[in-house]
Amino acid sequence: MKEKRLIIKRSGYPSKGEIVIGTVKRVLDFGAFVSLDEYEGREGMVHISEVASGWIKDIREHVKKGQKVICKVLDVNPKRGHIDLSIKDVNERQRREKLQQWKNEMKAFKWLEIIGEKLNIDFKELEKIGKKLMKEYDSVYSAFEEAAFEGYEVLAPIVGEEFAKEMAEIARENIKPKRVKVRGYFELKSSASDGIERIKKALLEAKKALVNGVEMKLEYVGAPKYRIVVEADDYKTAENVLKKATENVLKAIKKLGGEGNFIREAA
């Protein structure tokens, strides 16, 4: 017998343009019907023209019953209960992000189960708690993130102090702070006989900008380019370190008789 798992679904309908995850329930010649995993009792339809780009000879070569699919909501008609979906309109970045979001949410549901077992709370009550968290934070995982970084106190008014403390404990054990990266590259030149050594010396000045909790990588791209990558807990810190590192390097190369400039790369 399959073990029952806690799955908390949203009521209502998805919004037009929303990226959703679903399970293919039926595949017909003209399209596929998809059960929306995040919504209670909602099913959408992917017309054959929205399955993939180009002409499709056999839809079953692209989608199969039981398959997980990431879709974009094209249109919603609550009166008729219709939800039009597209698979082809979802790009690779959206697909990856949605899958990760879903995996995170499934983990969060499991964490609620663990707390429920510890505090002797049944699935029905856990579902109510989960829906409260979804209403406040949009997802249960986001609520756990809040507990990890802000403390149990922020959740206590929603789920009670005892439950909030358990959430914070699990969150701190399992959720690590997200790191951010900023990058760019130097173009450094020196016509001196020991020009390469002078450039290396100038680049080492970048490390003097480092502060606690920040990491920096310097990479040779190809003369005269040298990439710098700064990683920190937040963009403000990363930007400040990158700015200081840039100033240090450009000042040093000039002092050593060379020339240089810095070009910022998009995040």
UniProtKB/Swiss-Prot annotation:
Taxonomic superkingdom: Archaea
Keyword Membrane applies: no
InterPro entries, per database record: NA-bd_OB-fold (IPR012340), S1_domain (IPR003029), S1_IF2_alpha (IPR044126), TIF2_asu_arc (IPR022964), TIF2_asu_C (IPR024055), TIF2_asu_middle_sf (IPR024054), TIF_2_asu (IPR011488)
A GO molecular-function descriptor: translation initiation factor activity
Intrachain S-S bonds: none
Keyword rRNA processing among UniProt keywords: no
Domain S1 motif, residue spans: 17-88
Keywords: Initiation factor, Protein biosynthesis, RNA-binding
Family: Belongs to the eIF-2-alpha family.
Protein name: Translation initiation factor 2 subunit alpha
Organism (species): Archaeoglobus fulgidus (strain ATCC 49558 / DSM 4304 / JCM 9628 / NBRC 100126 / VC-16)
This protein's encoding gene: eif2a
